[in-house]
């Protein structure tokens, strides 16, 4: 009887018959990952689900037992720490993209960061690598005059973007890949490079097929088109 029910479920959900993958992904990369995955879904029928949040929040969930097959973080250290905590091979952590910062909402370029009257949104630096990069930029001496500004910290870069888009703040320091209209690029030497790493938490035939897809030239082009730099 149980086998009959299972066969009915597989018939009703043909994607499940080809396997499934559960992915935890840093909020900045979710839109790109969805675009990257669309051709994979069409070609394989493997079902992919996403859970997006800041890197720190996702790592905490994983270390407390949340079940995912892959974890796409927005930094290098967190996936390596997760791999070590779960006794996973170091080779299961890999670089998939390099990100950069932009300032959205400024009419005066980057000099607006020195204006205390301009409110600013960033991702929470305690849990989001792009938030930490933003704090490095704000700590520069030329922006010390702006230290009295209203600084709003979102739970993730996605929420920081929402704060700016809704008009709750004047400006936002965001990943370039979020493609905020009219944003100004922040020089790369103003903050530590944002190398984004992933880690394989659970190997399966579906996961291994997905990893092979991620290494393809097609995916590298999609990631570059989305506003990231490819890994070496």
Short names for language-model regions:
Residues 18-43, 47-52, 56, 60-64, ...:
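Exported/periplasmic ABC-transporter solute-binding proteins
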Residues 66-68:
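Short acidic/histidine-rich motifs immediately flanking catalytic phosphotransfer sites
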Residues 7-8, 63:
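Hydrophobic/aromatic side chains embedded in well-ordered alpha-helices
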Residues 12-14:
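N-terminal signal peptide c-region/cleavage motif recognized by signal peptidases
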Residues 1-7:
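Sec-dependent signal peptide recognition
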